[in-house]
A protein has these predicted regions:
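ABC ATPase "signature
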Residues: 220-221
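Conserved ABC ATPase "signature" region
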Residues: 104, 108, 115-133
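A short, surface-exposed alpha-helical micro-motif characterized by mixed small hydrophobic
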Residues: 202-204
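Helical segment within the ABC ATPase nucleotide-binding domain
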Residues: 176-188
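Catalytic Walker B motif of ABC-type/P-loop ATPase nucleotide-binding domains
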Residues: 162-166
Length: 245
């Protein structure tokens, strides 16, 4: 067994984040290994984005430990960040830049050089199907293309772990299908955690569900078990939250 297979690629150990007396998340724990695609499911405001920001080192936990590929993201963030690609829901894309400009900028920031830099840019442009918009201003692209530009940017340094916050939010059905296909392809050899409150996304992309409600992990298991005893995903959502979806 390889080191990647042995070591959890994403690990939350008793994560809590407090703002005064309010617990945005409380005692959240789970592990994801190489090749897993997990959907972080829950209603708006449940704690999905907060957990992701703590996992990626953008927020420090009030308690607990977040690890990426074995690296503590509070004390060893740089080492963990080299293994991580993080796509926030509304990441900065610099609307006056073209996708080519943006990818060159981030490739330089990641220390990619020469032939390797050119090859990586070419590979992510192909993977994310950006070839015919590569020279257009990002601000003039559709939301679907902007999302693909963001995905290409986080893939440049060949991360082992991808964390994506609402990757299909605001996309039309065709764009959603394309993003889903890309994520499934990437999940063959990477570890992916994606947040959503859209139940169809769970069945379409993820083999595992992490369901969070009011800052606490309410379910962690296979997608098939989430819809247990013949219940639909909508029924399980209501059962766990008391809310319709």
């Amino acid at each position: 067994m390889t080191d990647k297979a042995k070591t959890p690629m994403i690990e939350a150990i008793g994560l809590s984040k407090y703002y005064g007396d309010f617990a945005a998340i409380e005692n959240v724990s789970f592990k994801l290994h190489q090749g897993e695609i997990a959907a972080f499911l829950g209603p708006n405001g449940a704690g999905k984005s907060t957990t992701m920001k703590v996992l990626t080192g953008y927020l420090s936990p009030s308690a607990g430990v977040a690890k990426i590929a074995g690296h503590d993201m509070n004390t060893d963030r740089l080492a963990g960040a080299t293994r991580l690609g993080y796509l926030p829901e509304n990441g900065p894309l610099y609307p006056d830049m073209t996708p080519r400009d943006l990818l060159n900028f981030f490739a330089d920031a990641r220390g990619l050089e020469g032939k390797h830099k050119r090859e990586r840019i070419e590979e992510v442009v192909h993977l994310c199907d950006l070839g015919h918009v590569i020279g257009k201003a990002i601000g003039k692209l559709s939301r679907g293309y902007r999302q693909r530009v963001g995905m290409a940017q986080v893939l440049l340094h060949e991360p082992d772990v991808l964390i994506m916050d609402e990757p299909t939010a605001g996309l039309d059905p065709n764009q959603i299908r394309e993003v889903r296909n890309t994520i499934r392809k990437l999940g063959e050899n990477k570890t992916i955690l994606l947040s959503t409150h859209i139940l169809q996304e769970v069945q379409a992309m993820a083999s595992r569900v992490l369901f969070i409600n009011e800052g606490k992990l309410a379910f962690d298991g296979p997608t098939a078990e989430f819809a247990r005893q013949g219940a639909s995903l909508d029924e399980r959502f209501y059962e766990l939250t008391g809310q319709t979806h």
